[in-house]
Curated annotation (Swiss-Prot):
Present with 2610 molecules/cell in log phase SD medium. It is found in: Nucleus. Residues 1-23 are annotated as: Disordered. Component of the chromatin structure-remodeling complex (RSC), which is involved in transcription regulation and nucleosome positioning. RSC is responsible for the transfer of a histone octamer from a nucleosome core particle to naked DNA. The reaction requires ATP and involves an activated RSC-nucleosome intermediate. Remodeling reaction also involves DNA translocation, DNA twist and conformational change. One of its GO terms (cellular component) is chromatin. The modification Phosphoserine is found at S44. Belongs to the RSC9 family. The lineage of its organism: Eukaryota, Fungi, Dikarya, Ascomycota, Saccharomycotina. One of its GO terms (molecular function) is DNA binding. GO terms for biological process: chromatin remodeling; nucleosome disassembly; regulation of DNA-templated transcription; regulation of transcription by RNA polymerase II; rRNA transcription; transcription elongation by RNA polymerase II. Component of the two forms of the RSC complex composed of at least either RSC1 or RSC2, and ARP7, ARP9, LDB7, NPL6, RSC3, RSC30, RSC4, RSC58, RSC6, RSC8, RSC9, SFH1, STH1, HTL1 and probably RTT102. The complexes interact with histone and histone variant components of centromeric chromatin. Keywords: Chromatin regulator, Nucleus, Phosphoprotein, Transcription, Transcription regulation. Residues 395-476 bind DNA. This is Chromatin structure-remodeling complex subunit RSC9.
Amino acid sequence: MNSLASNTPLNGTPVSEAPATSSEPVNMFETMVANPIKVSRLQSNGVLTGPAANTKSIHYSLANFNVFQSLPKETARGVDDLTRMEMALLSGIPEEIKWSLKKYLTYSNKAPYMISLRTLPDLLPLFKTFILPLERIVEGLNKSSICDSKAMDSLQMGLNALLILRNLAQDTDSVQILVKDREIKSFILFILKKFQCVATGDNKWQLYEGNATFFNELTHYTLDLMEAISSYIAPAMKDDHYFQTLVSILNYTKDRYMVISILRSLSRLLVRSKANEESAADNLDHKTLSLIVSFLLLECDSELIIASLDFLYQYILPGSQRITELFKSKECSLILEATLPNLLSYNIATPDYHLLQKHKIRLIKRLKPPAPKEPPNLSEDLFQQLFKLNEPLRSTAWLRCCFEPVQEAEFTQISLWRSYESKFGQPVRESGRKLLPAVEFIKNVSNAFNNAAAIVITDPVTGKKRFVIKGIQPRFKALGIADGERESQVPISALKSKFLNDSKEITPARQNSIPEVKFPQELSDVSKVACTFLCLLSNDTDDGAGSAFCQRIRPLVLHKLADIPPLTLALSEYMENTSGL
């Protein structure tokens, strides 16, 4: 009481004591004033865009804010993203694990090489801690819907981890690591077995309807993983569990994506099979073969057709021993006979011969081109012959060499005089002789051509007068003096022409253009696979079912060869094997 009274005034407010000195370091964050700031998304990303961006200030940092100038300088950079993600998985904190799996999922989709299982060997064991517990959860999917939040979180994290592995399995390095892991392969077979229970109606385990969504997603990821590893566990022996389970699912499912994935897996499981060894394909029954062959009827689905042909190719490949087994089914034989020739031209634009059948061929009329607007040029020899003549013989000879008498034709007087004057005016004056005057030259036209006359034509609309020479027009080619004098005496109509045999004076005979028939230059993927499969069938023995089949469809194949030239090379083996049948 005494101590309290001595330190407390009458108003009850304690008296502040002097701060005691301490050797402990002062925390700078305790004295820092909290100032609210606004940070845009571009600033937080470290890039400045828009009008403020320039060559000197491309990168933008949060350190530009004044509030960050007071931060301690003695700081160290944190761990990189991949280490941070791995530490989050190991933390055991649900929020951290979910964040980490989400980040890994993004990497597996956009940059799988960054988290390759070969370069980061610790990742697969971490993912397995979320995937393997799914077996226990799947065992309970036959009872009731998952209501427990903890179980739901485990299921979602397991599905995310499985999806990450599914994405990484598309990389060659990563899938080679997965194949070596027995637990992963055992998990894949476990999920496939559960789906087989659903397919076969096994009473021991049937999926509860409310859990179908989760199980369907799980099955899709598992089938993708199976497709990725199937090439590495081939060839499948006769009683291979993977092969048998996949066949059971194939006969049950109607899911297109699953069917294609299963067919690819089955094809890869048969790779490297040997004729002298028992194979998983020996267990296939006619029902399954007929189902796979029936997929060839779906002309709108190229992926499914290719997957089916790939499987059939691998099925009969080892020594071509199973060709007879394939054609034992009449249904398979009929479908193959109906579809294979058509698949050779799948998605290929074949020539349209109907255009030629409908097109009427017409010859274009041979018409004389319109008369030239200027007199023809004179050869040097003809010019010298005319130049030596005196007037009016020179003008008369020039008119007959360069013009022809045409009854309905006309040529302006001024153009006629200028053409003559431009040819001979200067050379004649330089020789000391005189050119025939223009008036006399126009009068002389009647002497050169009996039916030609200088007339004046008045336009009835405008009243303008045109001074023309009626009855002549320029020739296409100048004649010699003797030929010109002879031809000038016989006038012709405007519909006829002199020297019709001269190809330069008339248009050559030609027909109207016909539609162009275009032949394809490339084969489609389906066509290539069909060619490969057909060539394999043709390798059967002469009395085998495959050879008989190839012989039956040969006329149809020849028709395709005529329409699609690239098929000639692709089917060269088939044509060689069937030539002597």
